[in-house]
Structure formats: C-alpha cells, structure tokens
C-alpha cells in the first residue's frame, strides 16, 4: 500500500515539473517554492492515507468479534462452546467419549460392555459367565466339562453323571461314593467269614441284591413251621 502512494507521489512531481517547464517563469524564486509546496502536499496525502489504513484495520478488528458471535448464534445450541469445553478437559481425555462410541458401534450389541464387567469381577471368577454360556447351552460341551473335572478329581470321589441320577428314583438316589463304600464293605465281610458260613445276600450287616420276592417265601415257611 505504501509503495503505491510513493509511485503516485513520484508521478505527480514529474507531471508538475513538466508543467512548470512549459510555462514562462515570471520570477526565478517562485520555482523552488512551488516544488516545496508539492512535496508538502504529497507528504500530507501520504500521511492521510496511512492514517486511513490504520483506522480501517482497527475497524476490522472491532468487527471480527461481532462476526464470530453471529456465527456462534447460527450454530447448534449444543455445539457453540465445544472448543472451550475441550480446552478445559484433560489432554488425554478429550477424545475418550468419541473413542468409546466408535468401539461400541463396531462391537456386537450383546458384547459391548463385557470387558468392563469382567474387569470389575474377581480375578478368579471372570470366566465363570463364559463357561456357563459355553457349556451349559450345549449338552455335549457340558459332558466334556464334567469329564475334565472328573479326571482332575480323586478316583473314588468323581462327580456322578447327571443322567444317572435323573433315571433313579428321587428317594433312592445314591451317589457313586456311597455305592462304592457299600460294595467294599460287603467284600470285606465276605472275606472275613468262613467259606461255609457266609451270610446270605439278604442278611448280614449290609443286605444288597435282594428283593421282596425272595423274602416272602421264607417268611411263609417260618409261619408254617411255627403252626
């Protein structure tokens, strides 16, 4: 902007000098005075232009906040002060909500918060929900789980199969441990007795493998002898 005014001043001085050379001089001392007047006028014009430019710059700076206010009014009410809120937040937490939203959208609807729930649980119980969903929904997988558990247990204390207990009578269900102990006790009693004086299966301390059909004839014979 200043260079333009200097060019304008130079052009006016040159034109004035040409114009003065064409006119006859009445007095010799008037020419230097005219040059000084032109220079003073050009200086005044230059100073005036600089002041006007400075005033225009100040006016633009004053109008800038008004323009920003107008833009903020045109925006959505919930997004006017978003930048100020982000500046007040912690630098490492500004985009945390956006990141969580993106991850939740990419994940399965039923598995969006599984990681948070597992982190809040006890370290030894984090996979309990996964085992229940993985094995209890499928019978074959549940049986595989039981087989794995039974292998890790003591041979005499393995978990009985659920199908075996379901087929028994509700009042006569016995565990595998009780059956094993009764069978072992019967073997020990048989070994301690004399070969010719061993107890009948329906007699002795632990009667087993007998039914009501075998007991009724013996009771009838005893009653007949008593009569």
UniProtKB/Swiss-Prot annotation:
InterPro entries assigned to the protein according to its UniProt record, in alphabetical order: TRH
Location in the cell: Secreted
Stored Pfam families: TRH
Basic and acidic residues biased stretches: 112-128, 184-201
Region (Disordered): 107-128, 151-204
Claim: Metal-binding is one of the keywords in the record: no
Keywords: Amidation, Cleavage on pair of basic residues, Hormone, Pyrrolidone carboxylic acid, Repeat, Secreted, Signal
Modified residues (Pyrrolidone carboxylic acid): 75, 89, 107, 121, 153, 168, 193
Residues bearing the modification Proline amide: 77, 91, 109, 123, 155, 170, 195
A single Gene Ontology CC term: secretory granule
Entry GO MF terms: thyrotropin-releasing hormone activity
Record keyword Transmembrane present: no
Leader sequence segment: 1-15
Misc. comment: This precursor contains seven copies of thyroliberin.
Family as reported in the entry's similarity comment: Belongs to the TRH family.
Protein's name according to its UniProt entry: Pro-thyrotropin-releasing hormone-A
Organism from which the protein derives: Xenopus laevis (African clawed frog)
